[in-house]
């Protein structure tokens, strides 16, 4: 049945989405940021590489993929949007393969397929699968990279890692995360092979590993050589990117004014709410352990709650775009709750703490290298973004969700899938029925994620 799922999932996903795609495609020439992406994509599709919109802030990966349409004479708005739908079809296949490998047989192929479907219809991700935005194809490249990295096929992994960075600069963080995990896993595996201590005692958090490395120059040399052999391809991405940062002075290309880096720690709190809210099956499984963790550590929990309140008070950033653009749900969340009631951002602190504990409990069973590298990567990719933008949460959420444990509670997975589908119905209904006009746009504006 494994081979059947590899065909059924992508084909079924595209066929299921096609009527909705055609309806979305007929509503507007451009949807918000598509006014930058589509003209640029059409120019590259026609091989007009001297055309570049200075307002674009990402590398040209999204537009280079448009070259695939040129031989097919599909350099149209519909053709560009179809690239995203095709990418979403590839994503569901990759999600299935990666999830099945992580589960290692637990739950079977049908369970992995169910999980892949659930992640593919994650409402913000599913919505942008119908538009020519960076998000879907950026995730495609990250998943291709992660898939090959899992299999220790480091050369193709590096190729797709570079492609992911061409899609979105912040994807360099996930390349660095996987590189760091490779280094840490190599240290553990090399030390375990010596047989000097039981394999189960060789842990990143334990002293046995580090004592072995310090006491054996030969072992240390073997580790270094093995790490260099595995990571040289990733270094060929990371080092040039460091050079780019040094020369450019910023991770952003083009118009840097709207994307200046500034410390914004509450992004972690927003992500925790996002992950706990959409990852219903993990939240159901980890809610009791998280509540017990808080109960057993009341003093630490109180201190953590106070720290959250201090961070919210001192470091809440409000980007002008968040207040100015009423075409996004975040505008309404902020204007009607966070911005309207001064106390609301503080009242959310207990929910932030509980959501963080749910994520922490979800991490506990994962490999030690992931437990170390993922939180660091999450901090780097989110906490220097001033703008609250749910699309920034998609890749870290999917990587976290892929690594969660099999719930063994069938209703939890079905509840999560059902909630995603119902929310998709609601958000597309709003998109199709709620129209309003801006003075400088001739076409009606609509509300999206």
Curated annotation (Swiss-Prot):
It catalyses: an alpha-D-Glc-(1->3)-alpha-D-Glc-(1->3)-alpha-D-Man-(1->2)-alpha-D-Man-(1->2)-alpha-D-Man-(1->3)-[alpha-D-Man-(1->2)-alpha-D-Man-(1->3)-[alpha-D-Man-(1->2)-alpha-D-Man-(1->6)]-alpha-D-Man-(1->6)]-beta-D-Man-(1->4)-beta-D-GlcNAc-(1->4)-alpha-D-GlcNAc-diphospho-di-trans,poly-cis-dolichol + a di-trans,poly-cis-dolichyl beta-D-glucosyl phosphate = a alpha-D-Glc-(1->2)-alpha-D-Glc-(1->3)-alpha-D-Glc-(1->3)-alpha-D-Man-(1->2)-alpha-D-Man-(1->2)-alpha-D-Man-(1->3)-[alpha-D-Man-(1->2)-alpha-D-Man-(1->3)-[alpha-D-Man-(1->2)-alpha-D-Man-(1->6)]-alpha-D-Man-(1->6)]-beta-D-Man-(1->4)-beta-D-GlcNAc-(1->4)-alpha-D-GlcNAc-diphospho-di-trans,poly-cis-dolichol + a di-trans,poly-cis-dolichyl phosphate + H(+). It is a multi-pass membrane protein. The chain crosses the membrane at residues 2-22, 59-79, 82-98, 233-253, 261-281, 299-319, 341-361, 370-390, 412-432. One of its GO terms (biological process) is dolichol-linked oligosaccharide biosynthetic process. It is an enzyme of class 2 (transferase). Keywords: Endoplasmic reticulum, Glycoprotein, Glycosyltransferase, Membrane, Transferase, Transmembrane, Transmembrane helix. One of its GO terms (molecular function) is dolichyl pyrophosphate Glc2Man9GlcNAc2 alpha-1,2-glucosyltransferase activity. Glycans are attached at residue 25. Its EC number is 2.4.1.256. InterPro entries: Alg10. Pathway: Protein modification; protein glycosylation. One of its GO terms (cellular component) is endoplasmic reticulum membrane. Its main location: endoplasmic reticulum. Dol-P-Glc:Glc(2)Man(9)GlcNAc(2)-PP-Dol alpha-1,2-glucosyltransferase that operates in the biosynthetic pathway of dolichol-linked oligosaccharides, the glycan precursors employed in protein asparagine (N)-glycosylation. The assembly of dolichol-linked oligosaccharides begins on the cytosolic side of the endoplasmic reticulum membrane and finishes in its lumen. The sequential addition of sugars to dolichol pyrophosphate produces dolichol-linked oligosaccharides containing fourteen sugars, including two GlcNAcs, nine mannoses and three glucoses. Belongs to the ALG10 glucosyltransferase family. This is Dol-P-Glc:Glc(2)Man(9)GlcNAc(2)-PP-Dol alpha-1,2-glucosyltransferase.
